[in-house]
């Protein structure tokens, strides 16, 4: 049986001298305790040395992918086919490929693994012609080359640093929040007014660290942290504070906590700058599109930049909202429109009704930027700047469209003005000068009811005036009737009635708004005939 053993220096093919020893797997390691014992079990048959590290890297990358290198193929055809013996290999996948392409029987079992372990332990004694120093140097060079190839290593492109930095930044924010809240509550017993005057947490801790006890504010100078007005307000509040007195030991512990808050805040600022620089080095286009914090959170959520590049735009859009998505799918409701991408500046500055559209468009352009950063050779951010400008223009159009609808200018812009030739003669419309009331179009019921009420009130007032005038005329006519002969009373009374009717009809005709003449009804005609007959 032959054994294929791969080293950093070259391929080695050993021949097993005593196969009976291989049956005892548990005690096989004893046969490789010394080089002399190892030479009794296996013997080197052929050694194919690599010329340089590049050739060794190509050979090992092919082995990891389960492929046969040209150099290995030549060795196997030359040595193993002539021997007509089975070949022991360390990788079962490689054995299957050798059997398929070269028609050689390959063996892979726990015995073979133990045999490989023994050969590796006595490699210097089993492979003559290779110095230990050369073997170690070749081993180290191949290890570095192989790691660089597998990890796609670059000094500037290590997204693991981004994942750890953004996670640490979130943890620092939580810790700072807890520490500052505890500090304000703790010192609030001694000087509660200070928390209302100074809203900035870092300034609050710096003032507290410099002054300490409330009594020292009168003589302390806080111009480094506060303006003159705020400083005067703090000193005035310290004199009339309603806080309790505390011991020096309590003040010391509070000051230690303030020191921790200030140090963590400074480290957080430094870490944020580091994250900005690292994001611009690894994913400049993504940073331009969504910002360094959102981009770093997307990379951390996916695990790496390469994993994020494999996601579709629809997945990137809702990345971070998985719970809401599955809850919506379970309850058959509307799925969420955005996840972590909601915190991007483009989505934040858009109106609520346009956030869904902008997040969808931003996700599509962000995926292009991610793939460009992950697989592209160019490290510039030109593509991200161009796509961001397009999205900003699109957002501006959407926002302007909504403003035009509200103001009513959209219709005016949509309709083109009617073309009028210079030779056309414009005529004057005299109907605009008419002062006569005209019948308007159909109006609303509420307006008609209001106008009816107004006309009724006017009609009542007119009737009251008419009655007063009629009564005066009646009194005058009665005085005249006393002087007239008794034969004519009936005729005069009828004339009085006609006058009353005539006076009542005149104001009513003035109140009618329409210009059309009223047609007399048949009942009125009959009454007029009767009056004429009576006069005759």
UniProtKB/Swiss-Prot annotation:
Would you say which domain of life the source belongs to? Eukaryota
Region of interest (Disordered), ranges:
414-440, 470-536
Q: State the SUPFAM superfamilies in the record.
A: Nop domain
| Molecular function terms, GO-annotated | ATPase binding; snoRNA binding; TFIID-class transcription factor complex binding
Biased composition, class Basic residues, residue ranges: 492-502, 524-536
Arranged from A to Z, the UniProt key words for this protein are: Isopeptide bond, Nucleus, Phosphoprotein, Ribonucleoprotein, Ribosome biogenesis, Ubl conjugation
- The Nop domain extends over 282-400
The Phosphoserine modification is found at: 109, 304, 351, 509, 521
> What subunit structure does UniProt give?
Core component of box C/D small nucleolar ribonucleoprotein (snoRNP) particles; the core proteins SNU13, NOP56, NOP58 and FBL or FBLL1 assemble stepwise onto the snoRNA. Interacts with NOLC1/Nopp140. Interacts with NOPCHAP1, NUFIP1, RUVBL1 and RUVBL2; NOPCHAP1 bridges the association of NOP58 with RUVBL1:RUVBL2 and NUFIP1. Interacts with PIH1D1. Part of the small subunit (SSU) processome, composed of more than 70 proteins and the RNA chaperone small nucleolar RNA (snoRNA) U3.
> What's this protein's function?
Required for the biogenesis of box C/D snoRNAs such as U3, U8 and U14 snoRNAs. Part of the small subunit (SSU) processome, first precursor of the small eukaryotic ribosomal subunit. During the assembly of the SSU processome in the nucleolus, many ribosome biogenesis factors, an RNA chaperone and ribosomal proteins associate with the nascent pre-rRNA and work in concert to generate RNA folding, modifications, rearrangements and cleavage as well as targeted degradation of pre-ribosomal RNA by the RNA exosome.
Protein name per Swiss-Prot or TrEMBL: Nucleolar protein 58
Organism of origin: Mus musculus (Mouse)
Species lineage: Eukaryota, Metazoa, Chordata, Craniata, Vertebrata
């Amino acid at each position: 049986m032959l054994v294929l053993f791969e080293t950093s220096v070259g391929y080695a093919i050993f021949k097993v001298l005593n196969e009976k020893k291989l049956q005892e797997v548990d005690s096989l390691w004893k046969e490789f305790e010394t080089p002399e014992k190892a030479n009794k079990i296996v013997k080197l048959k052929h050694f194919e040395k690599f010329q340089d590290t590049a050739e060794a890297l190509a050979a090992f990358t092919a082995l990891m992918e389960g492929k046969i290198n040209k150099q290995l193929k030549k060795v196997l055809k030359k040595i193993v086919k002539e021997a007509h013996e089975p070949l022991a290999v360390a990788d079962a996948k490689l054995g299957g490929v050798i059997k398929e392409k070269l028609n050689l029987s390959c063996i892979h079992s726990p015995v073979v693994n133990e045999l490989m372990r023994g050969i590796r332990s006595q490699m210097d004694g089993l492979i003559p012609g290779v110095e230990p120093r050369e073997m170690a140097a070749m081993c180290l060079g191949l290890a570095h080359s192989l790691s660089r190839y597998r990890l796609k290593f670059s000094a500037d492109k290590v997204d693991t640093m981004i994942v750890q930095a953004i996670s640490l930044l979130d943890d620092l924010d939580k810790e700072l929040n807890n520490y500052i809240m505890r500090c304000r509550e703790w010192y609030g017993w001694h000087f509660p007014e200070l928390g209302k005057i100074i809203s900035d947490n870092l300034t609050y801790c710096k003032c507290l660290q410099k002054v300490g006890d409330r009594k020292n504010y009168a003589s302390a100078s806080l111009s480094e942290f506060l303006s003159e007005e705020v400083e005067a307000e703090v000193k005035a509040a310290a004199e009339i504070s309603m806080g309790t007195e505390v011991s020096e030991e309590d003040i010391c512990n509070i000051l230690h906590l303030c020191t921790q808050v200030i140090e963590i805040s400074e480290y957080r600022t430094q870490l944020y700058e580091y994250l900005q620089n690292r994001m611009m080095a690894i994913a400049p286009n993504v940073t331009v599109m969504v910002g360094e914090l959102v981009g770093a959170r997307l990379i951390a959520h996916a695990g790496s930049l390469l994993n994020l590049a494999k996601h579709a735009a629809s997945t990137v859009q809702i990345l971070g909202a998985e719970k809401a998505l599955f809850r919506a799918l379970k309850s058959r409701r509307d799925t969420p429109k955005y996840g972590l991408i909601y915190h991007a500046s483009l989505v934040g500055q858009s109106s609520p009704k346009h956030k869904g559209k902008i997040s969808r468009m931003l996700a599509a352009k962000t995926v292009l930027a991610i793939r460009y950063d992950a697989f592209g050779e160019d490290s510039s951010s030109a593509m991200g700047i161009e796509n961001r400008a397009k999205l900003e223009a699109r957002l501006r159009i959407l926002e302007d469209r909504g403003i035009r609808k509200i103001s009513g200018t959209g219709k005016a812009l949509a309709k083109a003005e009617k073309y009028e030739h210079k030779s056309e003669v414009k005529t004057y419309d005299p109907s605009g000068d008419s002062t006569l009331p005209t019948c308007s179009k159909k109006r609303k019921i509420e307006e008609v009811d209001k106008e009816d009420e107004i006309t009724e009130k006017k009609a009542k007032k007119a009737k009251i005036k008419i009655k007063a005038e009629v009564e005066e005329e009646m009194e005058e006519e009665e005085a005249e009737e006393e002087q007239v002969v008794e034969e004519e009373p009936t005729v005069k009374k009828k004339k009085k009635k006609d006058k009353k009717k005539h006076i009542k009809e005149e104001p009513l005709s003035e109140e009618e708004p329409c210009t059309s003449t009223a047609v007399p009804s048949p009942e009125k005609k009959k009454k007029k005939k009767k009056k004429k007959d009576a006069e005759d």
